[in-house]
């Protein structure tokens, strides 16, 4: 009789997800500030890991792996080169019980998927460029943007834009 290998528990997945996210962020940080090499294979490797994880346990929810690791899984997914997998995970995230996936993570991923599919974003989370060239990608129904953002627990767009412009070296026009 063959013995079955025990399934890893949430803590095992949490540890692995956080390790992959740490690698992801270290590479990006070195690239941005230190002129390190961009390693696209890291995103592919992280996607393979996440694909295996999702096949085994579904989307890594807050209850299963904790808030930090659930958001770290989202971060890895944001950097995935596989848009179909991103869309699949977005549906899993939306289907999770309320409070099991951060609404912010869902909103940002939905905007990323819209952008990659050539559609206007819904929550206004995605910008392009840096400094004076920083601009918001097109947004669907801009008049109701803050209403949609509030429903996902996001700050008003003007506040978010100011934060983004401060991070990337440019103040919004009203602050000049």
Where are these regions (language model features)?
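Expand to "…catalyze enediolate/carbanion chemistry for C-C bond making/breaking, isomerization
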Residues: 127
